[in-house]
Design a protein with these regions (language model features):
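Catalytic toxin/effector domains delivered as secreted proteins or via bacterial secretion systems
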Residues: 1-80
Length: 80
């Protein structure tokens, strides 16, 4: 598992809250060479890796998450 789930500062807390409240707004798919292979989120079951980049005065905050294009479910939000 790469990335972390705990915010280091207020900007990160606010960015995570924003992303979790509306994950697909300005989100893009993260290209994966072999697709989603983690057994918890298999690409064959509809899962894709997504990211949002939130600009702040201190630089960008990037958050990755998993999205199931079939069910519309989101999971595994992490700071990158």
């Amino acid at each position: 598992s790469t990335g972390r789930t705990v915010a280091n500062n207020l900007n990160e807390q606010l960015a995570m809250k924003e992303v979790m409240s509306n994950p697909l707004e300005n989100a893009t798919k993260v290209p994966l060479k072999n697709g989603m292979t983690d057994p918890r989120w298999l690409g064959t079951d509809g899962w894709v890796k997504m990211q949002r980049v939130i600009p702040t005065s201190d630089g960008n905050i990037t958050i990755h998450f998993n999205y199931n294009e079939i069910t519309g479910v989101f999971d595994d939000f992490k700071f990158k």
